[in-house]
Amino acid sequence: MAVVRGGSYDSTSHGANTPGLVTPEQINHLISNLNLLDQIGNFEHYNMNRIRLVWSRMWSVLSDFFVSVGLSENLSVAIFVMDSLRQLAMKFLEREELANYNFQNEFLRPFVIVMQKSNSTEIRELIVRCISQMVLSRVNNVKSGWKSVFMVFTAAAADERKNIVLLAFETMEKIVREYFPYITETETTTFTDCVRCLITFTNSRFNSDVSLNAIAFLRFCAVKLAEGGLVCYEMTGDNVSSNTPDAPLSTPVPTDKDDYASYWVPLLAGLSKLTSDPRSPIRKSSLEVLFNILKDHGHLFSRQFWVGVINTIVFPIFSSLHDKKEMDEDENDEYSEGTTWDSDTCTVAADCLVDLFISFFNVIRSQLPGVVSILTGYIRSPIQGPASTGVAALMRLAGDLGNRLTEDEWREIFLALKQAATLTVPGFMKVLRTMDDVNVLGIAQSYYDVDVASDQGLSADGLDDDDLQMASYIVSRMKSHIAMQLLIIQVITDLYKSHTQPFSEANISIILDIFSSVATHSQKLNSNTVLHKKLQKACSILEISDPPLVHFENESYRSYLNFLQNMLADSPSLTNATLVESELVVVCEQILHIYLKCTGAPSEKKEPNQPVLHWILPLGSAKKEEVAARTSLVVSALEVIRGFERDLFKRCVQRLFPLLVDLVRSEHSSGEVQLVLSSILQSCIGPIIMQ
């Protein structure tokens, strides 16, 4: 083949653009003669000085040839043609690329295609070495060629050979550390390609150090972006963006030359995706780096961009946590695994979210409902660790924001807590109903029969392995459910105590609904005596502790009682004080009913199928223990009644007096009840009788 050294456009079109040049038959012929391959290299070399468009037309044909030969099964020929291409590329990169052209990218494209398609380890390693040599020796002239460089390294990052991955990352490390300004001086997509390449390295299964270093380089990229002034604004209004994250921001409008989203979004989105990586160190590192980037450079973001980041980058991180809560709760095995995150990752994520929201509250306060929903999702977790994390995070969020929250924002918090308390109940009750099909010998289905047999021993007969497994799961679920419900009312109590200003009556109403629903739910659980006996027998056989049902009922009513009492004391100007007082009377009345039922005192309302009792039997040991456990609560209720104002006591004495009389006739485990009861009769009932 003749070497073309000059001539017009037409003189090249006949030789270089002839379709037959790259037919399979001619390629096979060229492969058999390395001299012809060398001649093609010379042909391209001597035509580099032609008009760029002319050269581009020639190269569109020759590049296909290099790809075809580079993918040849003949390793020697493939190596030869890749080395020839390297020499041509080194020569080509000596020339400065014209503005707004992408000739370099076109020239290097054969490396990309062969790297992606070649089955030869030797060829892929050679390409990585060739690209590394070219970019490090000609970095000043690389412009559009960066795209091909990063595409080659991206393919190398996903390679099945460890040495290729490490070799490519070594060059990437040098590029990012020493030549970062060259990456962003041409076009936005170049930086995006660099970020995607680093993210691919984070997924490397060969070396965790490579993954962690790649994540660190992503943070380095963010620092360089911020330092380089790539984000600037034309502000609207009088306010100017402050360097302090918490300063109020007017809405910045990006200028035409400031396409900042195309720089930040791929970087942030890549880190967000890494938070679901199966490797714990990678998850934690990506979480910390992502939120550190947002905290350190968030002051550069407009309000509109922040909203997009929160909804598309931050919130999806926690989707696995929510998905786990929303799964069907009768799937026993699902709950044994917990969330896809371990406890440490859950804690890191919650802390980072709260820190970020507090730092930029004035900018992203509209996203409060989403943040609260995530934290209450933690609280709803059937696992103790995430639930405790959610409580701590929500308390810190409310504590640090303090009086900056509006009543509507407090309403969002309380509604989310109410939802967390109520939405889990139907699924939990569905789980409990599975015990209805478990028949246990020695346990009757009648309330009265169960009650009088409470002190009889329970044998292991009547429960097979499947029944025991089911009971074990239900006990575990019940313990987690009780802990979650108590956590919610504890959070509300702590929020109320820490809030210096009175809540609105609308928010007080929501709080009362939560206390009422939890207390009612606890009483309903405690009233199912047959279920208790089944679980008690199973726990005895399995040698595990019983679910703390009495404790649940005591604490829920105690918290409800204390909240009502504190609210009346702290808010004397409350317009609906009468309604709160009425609710307080109802709660006290309910506590007395529960205690009297436990002591076996006769009541006007009898259980179905319960025979008439002509005398009261002494309490058995089990009932005595329960009465002792309930004593402190009933004493608290009696002390509240004793503290009623005279007018309030007169209004409710008709409802309370029969209960007080029943208390006189009941058997108690402590003298405290009689002592407070005597005080009520003397200081409250006596004056009314003496009138």
Q: What do the PLM-derived regions correspond to, one by one?
A:
Residues 1-691:
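Intrinsic disorder/low-complexity flexible regions in very large eukaryotic scaffold/regulatory proteins
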